[in-house]
Amino acid sequence: TTMAPPIIIDGQPSMSDLSLEMFRKRLTKKPEEGTHEIQPLSGSRIHGHLNFAIERNYDPEAQIMGMELEGIDIAVLFPTMGLYFIARDNMDPRLSLAICEAYNNWLYEFCQHSPDQLKFAAMLPLHDVNLACAELVRCVNELGAVGSFVRPNMINGHFWHSNYWNPLFEMHQDLDVSMGFHEGTGA
């Protein structure tokens, strides 16, 4: 069976925003009462104390409010669904760069609401290692990025242990910033 595409609310996807019916269809056997923790997927939300973020459309002030509520002083913001858009083999490197530049510029502006508390990891155009290096330099030197974040998957035939990526690893070292790897939102 084909699952419905995820619902994206202004770039902020959430598993709790998906249709409960989609998950009911996948459940082959109803769990016995009391044997499993049941968490809502719709209606009242899993983290109801953060509903103000939805009401504020996930704006920077909502981010700060949530951080204060959770006792978090500084946050490094990472890409979510954006990583999937640029992880396609054979994407034109210029398109990948344009997407990354637009995203990084937007996230920089988002962080300017409270630059001492909000930091970001740059999204890099991985279809050309030289473009990735240049975007990393721009993001760190001009926008204040504190690192980068990439998916661990092979792209255009290059695994991460390939020498192809050495210039990017060296650029991170030269700039004294870290590189984060994560499969993505649902991992």
Where are these regions (language model features)?
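Helix-coil boundary/capping segments in enzymes
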Residues: 1-187
